[in-house]
A protein has these predicted regions:
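Nucleotide/phosphate-binding sheet-loop regions of phosphoryl- and nucleotidyl-transfer enzymes
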Residues: 1-242
Length: 242
């Protein structure tokens, strides 16, 4: 599944937990009124056909610069399409990133959560070709055969599990729902969904692929989290011992 198609899947099925997405095929079809939701725009490109590796991306606070970037990229590659994330400064400050793997194929169905802690050294390593998903994991949880209680394959000693407990419950629940969606449609899939965890335990489904995703100039002071009914239900329904 292409990156942009993956974002469309997540936005459709998990709208409250997926990074805001505005999909645009070309700058001429961009409705500027739709940008008013924020004053900061993260844009990424994806080809309608072929590989999506090493595609252009950028962050803008000026609409004209954003449009110029999109126009230039479209001129270079007519197969280019775009997704614009209308974000706030806190988007760039995730202390944890990770991967949710869902295995709905073969004879060993399961879910695996792998978590990486963000450090300045690791962020700098992105310039050397080491993506966040390539960073050494701080925590690996394996829900083999869809077990409710995970097998802890790895856990760094300095992790604050009291803080991580709730986000992990939410992420695991997402994994179960992804499995059920494919099961319902009769599809055997092996999917990998990237996520971010923020300072107050918020979970955001997205893929931070570049150093710019962690730009220090966008650091922020956290504001209170509005607990949605989805989140309240997860707290009440699940109490996972890690």
């Amino acid at each position: 599944m292409r990156k942009i198609d993956g974002l469309k899947f997540l936005q459709k099925n998990f709208p409250d937990l997926t990074v805001d997405c505005l999909f645009v095929d070309k700058v001429e079809n961009l409705d500027e009124s739709q940008l008013e939701k924020s004053k900061l725009w993260r844009v990424r490109g994806g080809r309608t056909i072929g590989s999506e590796l090493n595609l252009p991306q950028g962050t803008f606070s000026d609409k004209n610069e954003l449009k110029k970037f999109m126009k230039e990229q479209k001129q270079k590659d007519r197969n280019m399409e775009f997704v614009i994330h209308r974000v706030s400064p806190e988007y760039f400050s995730a202390p944890f990133v990770g991967t949710l793997a869902v295995y709905n194929k073969g004879d060993r169905p399961g879910i695996k959560i792998e978590l990486q802690e963000v450090t300045k050294e690791l962020v700098n390593s992105i310039d050397k070709g080491k993506r966040p998903r390539d960073w050494e994991a701080s925590l690996i949880l394996d829900y083999e055969f869809l077990s409710k209680a995970p097998k802890v394959l790895k856990k760094s000693s300095n992790l604050n599990m009291d803080f991580l407990k709730y986000p992990i419950v939410v992420i695991h629940e997402i994994g179960e729902q992804i499995f059920d969606l494919y099961e319902k449609n009769g599809r055997e899939e092996e999917t990998y969904t990237r996520f971010n965890i923020y300072d107050l335990g918020q979970v955001l489904l997205d893929d931070h692929r570049s150093k710019e995703s962690f730009m220090e100039k966008y650091k922020f002071i956290p504001s209170p989290v509005i607990t949605t009914e989805f989140k309240k239900r997860k707290i009440i329904e699940k109490d996972q011992e890690l």
